[in-house]
């Protein structure tokens, strides 16, 4: 079998590459790009090179510059920046935001190189972005793929549903070019059977279903034609235009189908299974001085606050588990993990029975990385990079599927 030439964008600490290489020796990374514009020290890129070597095809540049040197490839992968789509960021501007606009660099690569397959990852909110015009950004992304000659299948996957130790919901998009066997099969099914054919692809015969099976669908669904959306130009969708996309869907020949799916849930992997069971440094344990702060952050609130202009308002939020249950998968890790914050996990240490935060190694395990994958960078950045990372075993499963599809095509 010929090697599958891979270009990895927004590579981070290498989660996509690690998963693909665990899946098959048939993947060959011909370019990897990682650059964090807000930081002088490039900790994620340095981590990437510690594991995959100092090579000329590893590029630490702005994607605007780096895309000019992209070689021919068959698979484009990347977890493109999510801050402008994330519910964790107030006022996220979606595809118009500072990092959201990087989508247009991906689109330029699609137009120029037209790789056979594309696998992208983003936050689950991508399909509903922006908040004031739900579905606008995702419809633009689908339109870009359509105009570049691709079909797209997407799925919002909760890693915990498929046996991982973290409840991390992420949108995965798999695009396949219009000269592939998968495209021909999808086109034929939809042409002959319409909505029934789309359901069969999403439930059984498409890209995701064989590796992340579904029980079925809820009654929520939407369908339509991308040509019906009113674009002043591709970046400027009518301000009145919105579309409801659900967590599973398919776009073929400009027509989209989207449904709310019910996953087959694998046996759960509890948070307790990733904890280090030995004596840890005192810095991870909650001190008597800050326990009250933790209790406040994790507790329910209904309190009077004031906006910057002095306007009063009542702020309310419910209580969170404190400490986190060791018998359930963890909550989603954020980049602020390990700090004194509402979102950070607090667990009962199995060695001492005292309350503590998660260690960097435990965060790596929650994302399926080997222990100490991020060792060598400041500890704050170890948490930060894991808060940005994807769950490697999910990519491994998708890598096996892509390798099998490619092998079938090369045989035929």
Q: Where are the model-predicted features located?
A:
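Short, solvent-exposed loop/turn segments at secondary-structure junctions
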Residues: 14, 81-85, 124-125, 160-162, ...
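Core alpha/beta nucleotide-donor-binding catalytic domains of modification enzymes
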Residues: 2-117, 123-138, 146
